[in-house]
């Protein structure tokens, strides 16, 4: 996060520890996410924080989950998924042409070796002007960027891992 006060983490951290987990407050470098990057009603600048996960987390595999997700079962098996040489795994979006960036299983080592953060930042800087000029229909912030950078390099996860109840019917009408 960029600006959540440390006090906010006390109670959730205690709850996580009671369940055998932990909650770690990682502060992003203010220079990572640019204030000029595209935001929308449903996309804050913090959405772009996903680009920098490998910079701050050292584990070989990382599971990113959007804050609005409801987890209904143990996620341990997710870390056993064979990534088959893909830097990320995600769920196909409701348009059946792209993936949704709300659930990302990241091969951290591969991401780092292939400088994916740099590719995402460069693509963001390059596409934002086009989006502002209206040259990219249905531009959806970081999700559009993720899909461009990883277009043929992602593994599809079971749709139950990011089921969008109701949204699947109305999203692209």
Language-model-detected regions and their locations in the chain:
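Short, glycine/charged-enriched secondary-structure capping and boundary segments
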Residues: 11-13, 77-80, 119
């Amino acid at each position: 996060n960029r600006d959540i006060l440390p006090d906010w983490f006390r109670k959730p951290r205690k709850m996580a520890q009671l369940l055998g987990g932990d909650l770690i407050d990682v502060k992003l470098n203010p220079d990572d996410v640019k204030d000029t990057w595209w935001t929308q009603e449903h996309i804050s600048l913090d959405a772009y924080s996903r680009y920098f996960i490998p910079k701050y987390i050292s584990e070989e595999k990382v599971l990113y989950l959007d804050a609005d997700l409801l987890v209904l079962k143990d996620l341990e098996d997710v870390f056993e998924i064979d990534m088959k040489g893909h830097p990320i795994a995600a769920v196909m979006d409701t348009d059946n042409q792209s993936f949704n960036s709300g659930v990302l299983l990241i091969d951290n080592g591969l991401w780092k070796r292939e400088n994916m953060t740099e590719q995402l930042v460069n693509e963001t800087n390059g596409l934002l002007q086009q989006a502002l000029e209206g040259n990219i229909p249905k531009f959806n912030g970081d999700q559009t960027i993720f899909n461009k950078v990883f277009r043929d390099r992602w593994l599809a996860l079971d749709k139950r891992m990011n089921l969008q109840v109701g949204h699947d019917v109305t999203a692209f009408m």
